[in-house]
């Protein structure tokens, strides 16, 4: 399994930046990692992969 680090961006209804955070998840591949992050953090507006190990 690999470790993937995502930057999650949160925006309000008008699309204005509210907050962001970095989270990591272990997964077999990028698609699996993205699915896991989206499931755990559904309120994020953007999911940006910043690193994989």
Show which residues each predicted segment covers:
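Short aromatic-glycine-(Arg/Gly/Cys) micro-motifs in beta-strand/loop hairpins
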Residues: 1-18
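N-terminal processing/targeting junctions
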Residues: 12-14, 23, 48
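Short, mixed-charge low-complexity intrinsically disordered segments
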Residues: 39-53
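A short, exposed loop/beta-hairpin motif centered on an aromatic-Gly-Thr core
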Residues: 18-28
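Terminal low-complexity, poorly structured segments
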Residues: 4, 14, 27-30, 45
